[in-house]
């Protein structure tokens, strides 16, 4: 049980996919202008990442390995992720049309979010079992959501701040992301396995 909790903590905080592995930067920079949008995107990505990790494990274990078709892994994972994202998009559209409009193009773009595919491929490469795969996906999603919400809150404050003209826009956003990455480096050494 402790091993699973440490897996979630290390994936979310220490080996954060956005700040350490630099995966998922497109939605990180694109959807992080408002906290409400970031929370919605975080919830959608959490669902997709967790289910994609489970699905990737099942497809790898019960389809690709028995058929000796591991060379199709990336293509099959992309197709599985696309199906999961379409399901998520339909659920969000039916449950919250306001959130659906706020997320706009970024909801279907979860399909091409490299963090989703990266987590699925890393799960296979790390030889995680079923529970570890799901928790790894959930931890990665929790870390992504945490960083996305924190970054969007910082960006909302930057709008009201007196930022020099040369640093306005993407420049100050990248500097802020770099400072967040430095802050998350403080978690290094938190989990000893």
UniProtKB/Swiss-Prot annotation:
InterPro entries: Ion_transpt_RnfA/RsxA, NqrDE/RnfAE, NqrDE/RnfAE_oxidrdctase. The keyword Cell inner membrane applies. It comes from the Bacteria. The chain crosses the membrane at residues 5-25, 39-59, 65-85, 102-122, 134-154, 171-191. GO terms for biological process: electron transport chain. Coiled coil: none annotated. Keywords: Cell inner membrane, Cell membrane, Electron transport, Membrane, Translocase, Transmembrane, Transmembrane helix, Transport. It is a multi-pass membrane protein. It is an enzyme of class 7 (translocase). GO terms for cellular component: plasma membrane. It is found in: Cell inner membrane. Its EC number is 7.-.-.-. Part of a membrane-bound complex that couples electron transfer with translocation of ions across the membrane. The complex is composed of six subunits: RnfA, RnfB, RnfC, RnfD, RnfE and RnfG. Belongs to the NqrDE/RnfAE family. This is Ion-translocating oxidoreductase complex subunit A. It comes from Glaesserella parasuis serovar 5 (strain SH0165). The gene is rnfA.
